């Protein structure tokens, strides 16, 4: 692991390996490294960070453990987008001690502070704060992206890439941008397993996946999020994306009283407004099918023509209420002059 981190560090310009090396050459970086990254994030492959620190001390001869340097190398390899932030160095220092590589990678996904203000805790009276939501109740929790759009809710990309930066405000659902590729499923499944096994680790990743599963119910929901810049689909097929989120959140419990619960309640209150339901019903009935739209426009056009014709007829009647009959003229016959004998 340490050699992989060293060779793939962009700040190291000289690498003492042959270009054709199957592991550390150009071929390895292109064809082998993606699978190495995936294996580094598997829960059963985790090595305690303490072991990596000891090996680093033996290699460099340092007397003290340098969490920042080792954490930086790991994040550069596994989450390079995080390093594009100008304040990434300070955020890496805030990560502190980590149990292993997967723990550090998880922190890099949620280290950025969300753009929404932290809501005050709202304990529910008469209910336990640890009451869990079952994935089977999904239809009763949050509607799909199509249904939310019909109710007037818009989707926008959050200002940060933190997976805990999702919120709902004034009819807009803010979600962090997410790139989907062949390694996405392995990554999230291991992160969810880590949060469920380790007490006190948090449930930020689980809450995000649970939310995305509620929004993405079928392949028709995926283009809505893609057009908003929320989903970057490298899988190619919308059906595969929908199946991915629907399978990852099966039988996942999420604690009540967290940020996900607040977003859910705000969205439900917004969708329960009467005129929102009328708008959703109108769009669902008349604007789903293009032929239905054409029929509706034609009906409105004919109705408008009928009203105009009625107004014109009534107006003519009131302008000439008692029209005077025109005088009749007696028929005239031609007179032929008489001839004198």
Predicted regions and their residues:
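Acidic, Ser/Thr- and Pro/Gly-rich low-complexity regulatory segments
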Residues: 1-287, 314, 319-341
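Alpha-helical transmembrane segments and their immediate juxtamembrane boundary regions
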Residues: 279-317
């Amino acid at each position: 692991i340490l050699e992989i981190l060293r060779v793939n560090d962009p700040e190291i310009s000289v690498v003492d390996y042959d270009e054709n090396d199957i592991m550390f050459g150009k071929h390895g970086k292109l064809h082998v490294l993606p699978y190495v990254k995936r294996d580094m994030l598997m829960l059963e492959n985790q090595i305690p960070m303490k072991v990596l620190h000891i090996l680093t001390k033996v290699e460099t001869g340092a007397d003290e453990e340098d969490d920042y340097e080792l954490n930086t190398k790991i994040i550069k390899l596994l989450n390079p987008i995080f390093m594009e932030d100008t304040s990434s160095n300070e955020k890496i220092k805030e990560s502190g001690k980590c149990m292993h590589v997967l723990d550090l990678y998880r922190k890099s996904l949620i280290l950025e502070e969300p753009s929404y203000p932290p809501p005050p805790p709202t304990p529910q009276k008469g209910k336990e704060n640890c009451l869990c939501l079952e994935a089977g109740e999904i239809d009763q929790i949050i509607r799909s992206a199509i249904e939310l759009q019909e109710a007037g809710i818009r989707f926008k990309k959050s200002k940060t890439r933190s997976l805990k930066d999702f919120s709902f405000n004034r009819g807009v659902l803010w979600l962090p941008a997410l790139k989907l590729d062949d390694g996405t499923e392995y990554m999230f499944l291991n992160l969810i397993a880590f949060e469920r096994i380790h007490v006190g680790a948090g449930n930020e990743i689980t809450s995000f996946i649970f939310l995305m599963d509620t929004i993405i119910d079928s392949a028709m929901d995926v283009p809505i999020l893609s057009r908003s810049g929320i989903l970057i689909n490298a899988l190619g097929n919308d059906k595969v994306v929908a199946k991915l989120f629907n399978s990852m959140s099966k039988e996942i419990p999420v604690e009540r009283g967290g940020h996900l619960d607040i977003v859910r309640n705000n969205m439900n209150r917004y969708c329960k407004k009467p005129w929102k339901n009328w708008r959703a019903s109108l769009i669902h009935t008349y604007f789903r099918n293009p032929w239905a739209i054409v029929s509706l426009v034609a009906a409105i056009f004919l109705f408008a023509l009928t009203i105009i014709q009625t107004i014109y007829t009534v107006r003519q009647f009131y302008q000439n209420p008692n029209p005077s009959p025109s005088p009749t003229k007696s028929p005239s016959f031609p007179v032929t002059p008489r001839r004198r004998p």
